[in-house]
Amino acid sequence: MGTTAIIAAFNEEKTLADVLRALTSSPHIDEVIVVSDGSTDDTVEIARQFDVTTIALRQNHGKGYAMRIGVAWASHETLFFVDGDMFNVTDDHIEALVRPVAGGDADMNVGIRHRGPVLDFLHLKMHCGPVLSGIRVMRRSVWETVPDKYMERFKIEAALNRFCTYSGYRQQNTVIYNLGHVIKESKRGILNGLFSRWEMSREVFLLLFDLYLFETWRWSVPEEMPVAEYDLFE
């Protein structure tokens, strides 16, 4: 069973090459797909320098949609979602994330960046706040448990947690040490970064009520995937 790494990227020209270097040289990764979500910088040009499949959406559709496009093109049953704004990615990180799923010990393994023993304990042991990491490995069947309505924008990570457990699949969390991440305020400027963070937090907060309290997904009707124009480079 092979593993496809999928990067949903929006204007990640500063860090994407380092992430791709790690993925394309790893023996644990069999295929890499980059989905540029309407990037306006050199994200697509950088991706095309590597032996990967590059899908360039002509407009921005949100992270969940870009991930969905990547899954549609993936050749393998193990999916490794990776953020394009990370740095210091090593093969040890990749192996720690892929191995539990590839070895049959978990159906979804979520990578949590180390933030110190206290914060790690509060987050993972005391469950103070949802696990919303964009770095995760899963079987394709776990991805397919998520209703279409949640495969958009910032909803997808919280929805994956909910439906992985609800469907009886096994979720594992793995703390990843020495993995860097470029924060929104650094990429987009203070004001735009804070606004983007607020938008994401508000969307996730309302989503959690929907997923766990109102459960509107129980009577939701499957939706067709919206059609988007894109350029494909293989």
What positions do the PLM features span?
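A conserved acidic beta->alpha catalytic loop
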Residues: 36-44
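Conserved donor-nucleotide/metal-binding helix-loop-beta segment in metal-dependent transferases, i.e.
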Residues: 91-110
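Short aromatic/hydrophobic "clamp" motif used to bind/position activated sugar donors
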Residues: 79
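Short, well-formed alpha-helical segments that are part of the catalytic scaffolds
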Residues: 11-25
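Glycine-rich, basic loop-to-helix element that forms the pyrophosphate-binding segment
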Residues: 57-74
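Short beta-strand-to-loop element that shapes/binds the nucleotide-sugar donor at the catalytic cleft/hinge
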Residues: 109-123
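Cell-envelope/extracellular polymer assembly enzymes that use nucleotide-activated donors
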Residues: 2-4, 159
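Hydrophobic helical membrane-anchoring modules
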Residues: 151, 158, 165-234
